[in-house]
Structure formats: structure tokens, C-alpha cells
């Protein structure tokens, strides 16, 4: 959530920044009307509260003197209903203003390029050279389906579209990738392994920015009066660990990682990526989350992105690093790097990791703070999140980049200890 002071004090400036960087139209007239009404009702509410307090004090003094307080009691009762109505109206106005604030995206950092969509993202670097094949390249479905290793038909029978059953050595490869990523991030990159719930409450979803804007893309469960959401990424529970907390400076930065299933309705994906495992309702990801002091978030962003790059480099997968433009950034981010891995079957790079600095945007929603040792006061943390990496897409990239003419797949050297020494699949 943006600083409420921006909404109250500089609505026109904020509206222009949102329009120019996010193509977001803020209704200033509605905002100013609500703010004016809030001020009016708040003044009247405070007047009534002051009168109540004054009369209550007078009643106490009169009782102490043994005087008749019936008239004073009647007077208090006379404006009690108005005070209650005024307080309720004030709460309603505040709720509307908060609803507007919760729907506003974060403001991009100054060094983020302006752009309308992914076509205006800016490539930063490339690593590795895409392999030149001397045979017709197969995609991951053609490599896995004939052996029953990758089975979309059975998954469709069980659950519908955008699900996949994995079997045999490909299922083991998928598991090996997740274990390798966790071991790397914990053992070499200093993240703390964390096992998180897959079901979270609405407060958690609001904290990281999924609610209220993206509710249509979330899977929900209801049991009685209890509603929970299946996580779209373990960013949600990991980041919310610091919700309503004040973290001592000595504990910062907090670096956490989790391997989890993720669930997305893909409400806006239409007919994109319907073949294979590129875009699924259920998938697995190794997530990286950091909470730190504001002055450290830029360096932590670079560090986190580098940690994700190391995964791809150790797997020997060519990739490129892209700085997202304002029109392609996520709702909560101030700056985002995407890592895109080379897929031979598509002859292009596809996103496999997205690493974002969210500044104090999520922390303000969560009231996640740290105690500044200089001032001694609680201040908002900065939060960051990144994929380290998507497991299914990493598996696809390994299958396609390491394929042989006979349809077999070489196992990357770094994964062989996790595969019982297996050097080739098929």
C-alpha cells in the first residue's frame, strides 16, 4: 500500500504518476469528495465525543456533591444516538478510502524504464550459448508423453485442463531439481529453509497484494464460515511471517526460502500455453523472500537475482536477464528483473524467475516493521521476493536443452547425485 499521505496531501501528483507509469486512472474527484466528507464527519464526531466526555465529567462531579443528575443524563442520552451514527459514518468513509488505497499499485523506482508491455522490457545480459542441434528438436511433451512420463490425458480425467501427471524418471528429475535448488540456496546462499502452509487467510493475501485486486485468480476453500486461499506462490506465507512484527535490527536481513506447490486459476491467460506444463493451475516453485532495512533493499535485490542466476548456470541452461518496464511489472513491485531460460522447441527465451523489490509497499499493508537502532523507533521494512526457480519450467528446460537424437535426455552433472547417479533418461 502506498503512503496514505500521498492520497491525502498530493492526490493530483499521485494520479499523474500512476497514469504515466502504470496506466492506472485514479478518480481524483471521488477521492477528494470522500476526503472532504471524512474531515467533516471526523470534526463532528470529535465535537460529540468532547461533549460526551465533558458531560460525563460533570455528572461525576454532581454525583460527588449529591446533586440531581437527571437533567445531565438526559442531555447525554440526547446526543448519544448522533454520536453513534457519526462514528459509524466515519468508519464507513475510512473503509472506502482504505479500499481505494488497497487497489493502487506500487510506484516504480526512478530507474525503471517506461513502457506499455513486455515488448519494452530492457535486456541486461545473457549467459550461455543456445545449443545448435543437428536433428529435429522435440518439445517436452514429445519427449515425455510417448513413455508415459508426462501424462496430460490422465491429469485431465482427474482434474481437468492445465494439470499434468509425472511418472518415472521425469518425476524423479522434477524432485531432484527442487532438492538441488533448496540445497543451493540454503547451503551456499544463506537462506533459511522454511516449510509453509499452502492454505492462508485473507489477511495474508491482502498483506502481499493478492487481495483485493486479484481474487479472480485465486483458488478458495470454504468450510462452514472459514474461508482459506490456496497460495499462488510461497511468497505469500513467507512474507507474512513478519506481518504485525517488529524485528530487531540485528536479525536483518531475514532471508527465507521454501519449496511449495502453487495454485493459480490463470483467469486472464485465455488460450495461451495450453500445451504441456508451461502454464499450469498447480505447479511447484522454490521461492526466495527477504525482509531488510530500507537502505539495504537495492543490494538485496541484486543479490537475490544473482542467487536465481546461479541455479541456471549450474544447470548449464542458457538464459537472459531482463529489466521489466513499468507496464509489465507486478502490482506490488518497485523494480523487477526477470530471468528467461532458452527453450529450443520455441526458439526463444521464456520466463523462469521473477525477482522483485517491493520497497515498503507490502510492509505497510502488513505493518511489518524493524526497530531502527539510531532512532529507537519502529519503521517499515522493505520486502523482496523471487523465484529460485520455477521447478516445472526448469524441468522443461533441462529436457529440451539436454535431449538427444534418439529422444533420450542427458542428466545435468549437478543433478546426478539427486538421481542416484543416473546419467541419462530413456
From Swiss-Prot:
ATP binds at residues 264-266, 351-354. Its EC number is 6.1.1.11. GO terms for molecular function: ATP binding; serine-tRNA ligase activity. L-serine binds at residues 233-235, 287, 387. One of its GO terms (cellular component) is cytoplasm. Consists of two distinct domains, a catalytic core and a N-terminal extension that is involved in tRNA binding. HAMAP family: Ser_tRNA_synth_type1. This is Serine--tRNA ligase. The lineage of its organism: Bacteria, Pseudomonadati, Pseudomonadota, Gammaproteobacteria, Lysobacterales. The gene is serS.
Amino acid at each position: 500500500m502506498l503512503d496514505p499521505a500521498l492520497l491525502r496531501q498530493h492526490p493530483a501528483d499521485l494520479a499523474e504518476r500512476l497514469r504515466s507509469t502504470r496506466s492506472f486512472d485514479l478518480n481524483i474527484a471521488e477521492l477528494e469528495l470522500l476526503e472532504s466528507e471524512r474531515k467533516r464527519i471526523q470534526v463532528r464526531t470529535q465535537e460529540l465525543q468532547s461533549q460526551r466526555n465533558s458531560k460525563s465529567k460533570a455528572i461525576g462531579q454532581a454525583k460527588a456533591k449529591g446533586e440531581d443528575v437527571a437533567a445531565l443524563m438526559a442531555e447525554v442520552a440526547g446526543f448519544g444516538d448522533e454520536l453513534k451514527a457519526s462514528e459509524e459514518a466515519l468508519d464507513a468513509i475510512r473503509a472506502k478510502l482504505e479500499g481505494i488505497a488497497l487497489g493502487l499499485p506500487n510506484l516504480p523506482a526512478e530507474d525503471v524504464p517506461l513502457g506499455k508491455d513486455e515488448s519494452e522490457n530492457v535486456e541486461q545480459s545473457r549467459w550461455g550459448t543456445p545449443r545448435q542441434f543437428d536433428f529435429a528438436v522435440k518439445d517436452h511433451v514429445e519427449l515425455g508423453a510417448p513413455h508415459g512420463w508426462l501424462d496430460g490425458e490422465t491429469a485431465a480425467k482427474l482434474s481437468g485442463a492445465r494439470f499434468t501427471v509425472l511418472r518415472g524418471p521425469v518425476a524423479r528429475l522434477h524432485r531432484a531439481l527442487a532438492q538441488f535448488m533448496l540445497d543451493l540456496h540454503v547451503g551456499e546462499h544463506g537462506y533459511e529453509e522454511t516449510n509453509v502452509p499452502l492454505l492462508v487467510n485473507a489477511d495474508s493475501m491482502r498483506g502481499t497484494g493478492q487481495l483485493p485486486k486479484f481474487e479472480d485468480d485465486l483458488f478458495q476453500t470454504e468450510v462452514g464460515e472459514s474461508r482459506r486461499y490456496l497460495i499462488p506462490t510461497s511468497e505469500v506465507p513467507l512474507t507474512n511471517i513478519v506481518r504485525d512484527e517488529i524485528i530487531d535490527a540485528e536479525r536483518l536481513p531475514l532471508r527465507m526460502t521454501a519449496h511449495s506447490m502453487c495454485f493459480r486459476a490463470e483467469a486472464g491467460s485465455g488460450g495461451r500455453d495450453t500445451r504441456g506444463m508451461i502454464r499450469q493451475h498447480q505447479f511447484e516453485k522454490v521461492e526466495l523472500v527477504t525482509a531488510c532495512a530500507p537502505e539495504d533493499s537495492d543490494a538485496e535485490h541484486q543479490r537475490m537475482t544473482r542467487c536465481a542466476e546461479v541455479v541456471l548456470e549450474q544447470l548449464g541452461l542458457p538464459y537472459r536477464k531482463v529489466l521489466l518496464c513499468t507496464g509489465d511489472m507486478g502490482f506490488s513491485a518497485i523494480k523487477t528483473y526477470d530471468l528467461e531460460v532458452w527453450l529450443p522447441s520455441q526458439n526463444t527465451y521464456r520466463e523462469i524467475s521473477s525477482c522483485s523489490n517491493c520497497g515498503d509497499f507490502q510492509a505497510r499493508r502488513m505493518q511489518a516493521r524493524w526497530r531502527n537502532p539510531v532512532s529507537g523507533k519502529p519503521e517499515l521494512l522493505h520486502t523482496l521476493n523471487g523465484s529460485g526457480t520455477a521447478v516445472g519450467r526448469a524441468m522443461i528446460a533441462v529436457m529440451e536443452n539436454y535431449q538427444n537424437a534418439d529422444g533420450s535426455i542427458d542428466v545435468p552433472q549437478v543433478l546426478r547425485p539427486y538421481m542416484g547417479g543416473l546419467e541419462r533418461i530413456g
